[in-house]
Amino acid sequence: MSFNHREIEKKWQDYWEQHKTFRTPDESDKPKFYVLDMFPYPSGAGLHVGHPEGYTATDILARMKRMQGYNVLHPMGWDAFGLPAEQYALDTGNDPAEFTQKNIDNFRRQIKSLGFSYDWDREINTTDPNYYKWTQWIFLKLYEKGLAYMDEVPVNWCPALGTVLANEEVINGRSERGGHPVIRKPMRQWMLKITAYADRLLEDLEELDWPESIKEMQRNWIGRSEGAEIEFAVDGHDESFTVFTTRPDTLFGATYAVLAPEHPLVEKITTPEQKPAVDAYLKEVQSKSDLERTDLAKEKTGVFTGAYAIHPVTGDKLPIWIADYVLMGYGTGAIMAVPAHDERDYEFAKTFNLPIKEVVAGGNVENEPYTGDGEHINSEFLNGLNKQEAIEKMIAWLEENGKGQKKVSYRLRDWLFSRQRYWGEPIPVIHWEDGTMTTVPEEELPLVLPKTDEIKPSGTGESPLANIEEWVNVVDPKTGKKGRRETNTMPQWAGSCWYYLRYIDPHNDKQLADPEKLKQWLPVDVYIGGAEHAVLHLLYARFWHKVLYDLGIVPTKEPFQKLFNQGMILGENNEKMSKSKGNVVNPDDIVESHGADTLRLYEMFMGPLEASIAWSTKGLDGARRFLERVWRLFVTEDGQLNPNIVDEPANDTLERVYHQTVKKVTEDYEALRFNTAISQLMVFINEAYKAEQMKKEYMEGFVKLLSPVCPHIGEELWQKLGHTDTIAYEPWPTYDEAKLVEDVVEIVIQINGKVRAKLNVPADLSKEALEERALADEKIKEQLAGKTVRKVITVPGKLVNIVAN
């Protein structure tokens, strides 16, 4: 008899809901365990089979930890602001709030159908004013600390969408959505000073149990480098510019300088003869993204300004060029070019026939740049020194002569925080007619997003909120001064920067969260999600957390102690699942046909959690067959408990494999090696089928081990075993080291290195006794007839090799 997954899964999901089985109490004397999923964006497409992979992994941990006696916090919520809902509203004229709510209801239904043990009383939604009140409150704190400021920055402006796009939303000079052309133009934007935390964001990575690859990505993103800032005067102008270089020792090899096209000096120093060429070049650059501009493989382009810089040491005149491979947002937006010892500068110099001067010996700069170390040459007071000595000596000279200084630079830029969007958190700031600005007072938060039918870009670069006159225009009740609300909204990252804190105290309307509760639960013990958030989300959340730590709001320096990235589930054809390819698998269909337990088991058994693996219907069927095998072992045709499950079997053949299973499954779950844990559960079932009778204690232990992966069938079998309560808080099985040892081992007997027989002997048999047994074996005696034994090599517990001729 097969089990009816539809009946069983509905029965237990109803039970958990009615009994609030997974409600997390705040008051508890148990140790805490906080296990978190990256909360999803509730899209119109609903859940796909990639979501449950990470969710099942955290659920297994949560369920095991409850059984191990921990007070477990395992919550779920919705990262529900963002571009797709707004785009949908633009396309259909529907309200993004209604659309979002409908999607959330669908996601919640789907997630509940998979049997995850979330505490739904703690559900949060970033678009709920009671939630984003605190997102806005954090913004006020950032502003008070001088970490939120407005600045004129070049942004990716998409005229067709009427909005600014983040770098990640621009691909090859076009918008990711719709493929519209994107240009760079300066606009006043809100920025967050994440650079003020660069060193701490870098140093504190050391203490985290994160994959090394993710730490490395964060290190590279922050990109700390030590070097010098050097000032170059412009010949014939009362102007100068600064460059940052990690190799001030090569200053004597500088033969030209390059400014970023957006550099403010370009306008001032370009000569009339060069102006047409410069203007044409600036127009061409506008449509390129930073990524395209810095692509190492692309042709170098540039144009001469007609102006010259004065070399700070020699007084030589160096031509000043502009080129798109220099970015205004990186370093100072200007470089000194040392073509003999830098690949990009070398290519540029070759393309435009600029001089190349060798200052570090060891290469052949006629053919290629030399980037290695070596003795300095053609460098006046640096001649004969190696790289490190020369760097120190040059910095000392620059500082003595007022021409430069030692400097640490970062690749990390301040975070562009404003979006010209409707569907985001309003930024709580008012701009007054006298040019001042103030923040909305704390007691007036949340500043609620107004409902509107007019969700279309304003076209001026402001958000659609600019169209809502009665919301935008305000008057100061004290002075009668007129003002306009900030019309930009926050990016989707804002709500996800701190959501893990709100789960700890989701209904608190007096503060972000109770400090005592934060102390009790932080940091998050395990955080699981996709690697696509390796840099930005995790870096932004760490930044906000550190700000809150400095304000005394959170008690830990870091939010997430252990991080794990699950791999991707690909389509059966090994391609990424996508609607356009028609290879998306909907979990609803699988829950209907095979059951949630089968889906959970299959996704955990596919392979290592971090690997990307193709979906296989055959594999799914195999998972279902295993569960049916388990069911038949426990339950008779007429639905009773198998009578061969007894308190004291006559012959206890399962003892060793049971203790091995408890040990391996427990260790593998802890280490997130779910596929090998499930293999061991299969080994146990195979052995149990061979046994005449099965000890009830072992069978109960097995059900406990299976239940975190397959909770519905776990509960049902637990009930069949005679229990009336849920299995969720039953104590986790333990094993006895002494019972893991094999009593009997199989020994291989070889003659001249070839296997001739096998023997089962007691595991603790001595070397001498083993040799005796081997020589007395009937098969071996036959093989040795007429031969002389020259030597016997014995390895206890493994083999006996007899050398004879």
UniProtKB/Swiss-Prot annotation:
NCBIfam families: leuS_bact (TIGR00396). It is an enzyme of class 6 (ligase). InterPro entries: aa-tRNA-synth_I_CS, aa-tRNA-synth_Ia, Leu-tRNA-ligase, Leu_tRNA-synth_edit, M/V/L/I-tRNA-synth_anticd-bd, Methionyl/Leucyl_tRNA_Synth, Rossmann-like_a/b/a_fold, tRNAsynth_Ia_anticodon-bd. Pfam families: Anticodon_1, tRNA-synt_1, tRNA-synt_1_2, tRNA-synt_1g. ATP binds at K579. Disulfide bonds: none annotated. This is Leucine--tRNA ligase. A motif ('KMSKS' region) lies at residues 576-580. Its EC number is 6.1.1.4. It catalyses: tRNA(Leu) + L-leucine + ATP = L-leucyl-tRNA(Leu) + AMP + diphosphate. It is found in: Cytoplasm. Keywords: Aminoacyl-tRNA synthetase, ATP-binding, Cytoplasm, Ligase, Nucleotide-binding, Protein biosynthesis. A motif ('HIGH' region) lies at residues 40-51. Belongs to the class-I aminoacyl-tRNA synthetase family.
